[in-house]
Swiss-Prot record:
PANTHER family noted in UniProt: DNA-DIRECTED RNA POLYMERASE I SUBUNIT 2
Protein name: DNA-directed RNA polymerase subunit beta
Gene: rpoB
InterPro entries, per database record: DNA-dir_RNA_pol_bsu_ext_1_sf, DNA-dir_RNA_pol_bsu_external_1, DNA-dir_RNA_pol_su2, DNA-dir_RNAP_su2_dom, DNA-dir_RNAP_su2_hyb_sf, RNA_pol_bsu_bac, RNA_pol_bsu_CS, RNA_pol_bsu_protrusion
Region Disordered, annotated ranges: 556-576
Organism, scientific name: Mycoplasmoides gallisepticum (strain R(low / passage 15 / clone 2))
Amino acid sequence: MKKNSAFHNTQYSPKVVRRDYSKVHNKYNPLNLPGIQVNAYKQFLEKELEEIIGSYFPIKSPNGKYSVEFHGMKILDPQITKEEASAESKTYDASLYVNLSLVNHQTGTVKKISKKSAKSKAEGIYFADIPLMTENGAFIVNGIEKFVVAQIVRSPGAYILNKSQVKLSNSRKRNQEGYICEVFPSKGTLMLFYIAENKDFVQAVVRDVGGESAKVFSITTLLKAFGLSEIKIKEIFNNNDYILRSLESEFYNEKQILNEADIAQLIRDIESDRISKVKSLPIDQKWKNLVLDWYKLNQEKQELLNSSNPNPTKIESLNTHIGVVLRKLICEKAAKHVIQELSISTRSLDNVSQKEEISYQSILLQHFFQKKRYDLSSAGRHKFVRKLRVSERLYQRTIAQDIKDLDGNVVIKQGTLMLKEQLDLFKRLSKEKRLDIIKQIDFINPELNTQFTDVNTYEEVQIYVNNDLRNETTQIIGIDGSNESIETLTLADLISIVSYIVNLPFNIGLYDDIDHLGNKRLKLINELLKSKVQTGMMRIEKYIKDKLQTADGNNKLADQDAENDPDSDLGTKSSNDLTVKSVINPKPFQIVIKDFFNTHQLTQFLDQQNPLSELTNKRRISAMGPGGISREDPNLDIRDVHYSHYGRICPIETPEGMNIGLIMSLAFYATIDKNGFLMTPYLKVENGKITDKVEHLTALREDEYIIAEASSYMDVAKDGTINNEKIIARYRSSQDLYDPKQVDYIDVSPKQVVSVAASLIPFLENDDSSRALMGANMQRQATPLLKPYSPLVGTGVEYKIAQDSGMLVTAKNPGTVTYVDASKITVKGEDNKSTDYNLLKFVKSNKNTCYNQSPIVAVGDKIETNQALADGPSMKNGELALGQNVLVGFTTWSGYNYEDAVIISDRLFKDDVYSSIHIDEYTIECLRTKNGDEEITRDIPNISESAKRYLDEEGVIMVGAEVKEGDILVGKTSPKGQVELTPEEKLIQAILGDKVKQVRESSLKVPNGGDGIVAGIKRFSIANGDELEDDVLELVKVYVVQKRKIQIGDKVAGRHGNKGIISKIVAQEDMPHLEDGTPLDILLNPLGVPSRMNIGQIFELHLGYAARELAKAKLIEACFDKKLADQLDTVFGLEKSKTQSLIKNLVEHMKSIGVTSLAQTKNRVRTIDIDIVLKQLGLTYDDLAFKIATPVFEGVNMEDLKAIMSEAGIDPDKTEGKFKLIDGRTGEPFEKPISVGIMYMLKLDHMVDDKIHARAVGPYSKITQQPLGGKSQNGGQRFGEMEVWALQAYGAAHNLREILTIKSDDVRGRNMTYNAIVKGLSIPEPGVPESFKLLTKELQGLGMTLNVLYDDDSIENINNISVVDESLEPKIHDAEFDTFTLDDYNDDNF
């Protein structure tokens, strides 16, 4: 046979070898695929939870008498295991204890909660039970596995835009256009700084605290309010025109400030000596003192000026002092103006005890520059630094000054054009703080300079506005990016923002693309839960403050309430009785935790349809959720694929319908950084040579580099040097040819662009994207089969996905298998310690599929770390196995595969090829009611003994019983309501005592379509000490197993979006067959390929057939080649004993037909000969699996396909992959050759057993009296308007009348009809539909009267009677309803 050099064999495990056609051979392995949430939750429990709780303490009483202080917290070990939580429908959680103390500062006493009794498990107060995460990243809540989906949101930061809107809480939006910088904090109010389109000065729009409206300020008013003087503002911005015009547009300057109403009035009060009589708030004292200082200084100056010998030096000194006082006054008044406009509370201060020293400016600084109130978060600071640093605006700009280092040496000369090399140098020196470009901000109040020392520096560089003319300069101000630990807003940030805006009209700076992934980040479970915990802690804080305020004697109303309410906590207690428990109520904390895991939008049932669906659920990200995007939002830009998604978010896998583009999947290698930004790995390229150094880049960092695509690996020397002169690479959104020496990085793998599910589709590159999307989504819907087989044509990631799904049992340590049975594997390690691995047996998943694990190792096997020990559902030898390899032909067959219908052979039905197991859980509760307790019993009234034949003596079904719909699973009786007894019943009760109970049957029965075998019973009872909900005495769960064979109406699909419904099951002998007698398994319509453009399925078909033929060839060759025979168990994934028996039996069979050498086998050993030998050992062709891996974007190409077909004995040029087919019914060959091959087909969750449904009678809607809809409500099929037209077209008047009356909403008519059918009478005439009654009532509701006009012209008023009254019924059939106009009515009618 011809050796194909385009492949290599890859061994994934001792039983899995694939012929690998990948072209890129780097050894980069992805991290644990579902791992991102696991690490986030671990960080939350170990670090963040304590930080959040601790940040709210100490809590002090208003007068400082008491304080509640925090001394740490402890999470105890869980009381039950994960397995027990699942089995007993409990939550897998651990108790949180918080150690608090109550300090009385007057007496010095400290009260704590100590661990006094065995009942209290730890020191401190019990706060809540915190659910714990399993190793697989899920939570077990009430016995159900749940998962928290990561949310993708806009990152906090500064954004440069030309259009923006401020959303207000009353559903209004304020739109703004121009040169805009949007400051988007993690916590705090949104701010816009902008130059409007028709204005020439800078303004700021700030949303007020309530979010009701947005206020506009001149930028200089804000800067003054924050503590900058007009002189300093002009100095910082170098007398920029926009800033000068902003100063002119506002009121707060030395000329106009004294004319301000409050100040003018105060001056008049001082002059008239009324100052002492004017009462003022402590917060107003600061500016009033400043006015007083100004008045005194001004008086002194006037006296000097009026004196006969004025001292110029002293006057100059006084002028300086007056200037300082005025500037301080301007700042304070500007701050007051901002605070009042934004409705900022002046009470909610941290420093409450020092009210006399409080000023409006200090409140404003506290509101905007304090993390508790205005938080940028680490992600926001990271974005601020990247956007507002000077280097961001220097690219391709000419420097208008010498840039020197701290020693005075010129690093970059004036006139230098800043290109990548110079910019890299500038960035490096700037980060190291080695450039002499750093300036300091000076506040008017000197104490602020010391308070904000670390954060009031900025960088400044002069550049030319025009690179060519160089006649005008402008300055660029940027933040000092060396300290990224500051998570609050700073004055330097605001100055840098203003600088950015005023330079935008000169095209200095870049606008932001809001859909770029660098501007979005992931909120993982730690952040989502953090916001909920903060809500709970705020409520607890408020409760503690209220209690302490009452105890402090500060709240008279509270004291009165306590006196009036003798049951209140503190009303009956003296302050000496105050304890930690009496001032704290952890209930709000418990509620938010419970709500998060039960009702939060992003907390979902874990999709356990199969291992792939579970894994993709854990890698899903959603743009919806609290503060996210609504699914009704029509914005296509949000949903569209963006170039920055490359390697981070899959461009293929997303739902169809309303959620398209809002729910996404992480790409195969995607990870996240500490700030929540998505990263993807690249290999570093240095001087045209690919190194082994892997770096993970965020979308923003990637924008700085030139990155080559993975196809560049095709021509690489042994040392990693790229041999091509030019290679395809991308820079931001554009692709071009680059010299390898210009390239910075290269992709680690061609599949890094797609998700886990999309990477399972072979020949993905040959499929249309919309079909690939369907293929990726439908693999998640595949039902786990009884006998799964991994695909012959795979992509090489099947083993990795199975391993990371959490359903594959893998060895923790190396060793030897010492014990194996269906439920347990024991491995003895190298240290002679044994480890037991318990296997799941027939467990119901969230999607009612069967999760079962079966061992794939034998006693004596040597085991390596992470080697597969037992397969989970949809797995074979540790590989993902969602479907079956079946022989498919593309041909029509009597029209049965028209419009995507599928014809299958009954072999798939008889041999259980597509059979699956489903487990349904039925639950019944035994309740305590006001009429008495319900009872689970076998003694059920009005039920025959035959109906109770499978119930045990307690009334519960026996395990193993085969049940049909309507059968009783659990017998239960409920007490009837209290009714008056008849004399006869009273007599019987008097004779028999109280034995005759008034009970009714309320048993649990098998619903429609619920036939199966009872597999298990779980009983929970208060009597046995189980925890149940209030008023529940006993809970019984019954598990019924169904084995579902494939049938007409089931949905099947390939991996390329080629889906269809089974329309006919044909006998195997009637199916078309190949010339060697092999019958086809499935017939697909050839018209399903061209328009869908999913040609990948055709490639898979031919490659799969070549693999099947190669398996036969390898088996025959192994009969004459001892070396190959020894390897065959690994090639086929069979047990060694079975492989040896197979070869031995085949050799004997060949001898019986006279074949003794390999040369003789070519024409004499037929398919049927191999089939006979396989059947002797209980095997099928599916067990002869010669597996191939063709990874996405780098797998089998046309040359490889032709080579492997030739190797398998198929002439690709002569046959084109098409074969002569013979009709099984007639024995006649088809007219032309037909494409036949092996395709991997899945049985999907959409099974006809779940959908098929019939109704004779059933429930009706209360209002319309029409039948309900849907299977769950035993509803009918809606006969709509168009269906009515169809009957009208055929003139089927009687059918139509039936459908619109007795089969719909003619209440009396349907009852009479039912009665007639039961008694065998003829069907009566229909009456008036309820919808007509509804119409009359709605018209009467509009104030209109309705009259009935009879044939004899008599009129009857029907406004006070029902139109379906029996006495009217006969007349109405022959009546006409009069039309009316308003003119017909007189006043008496109203």
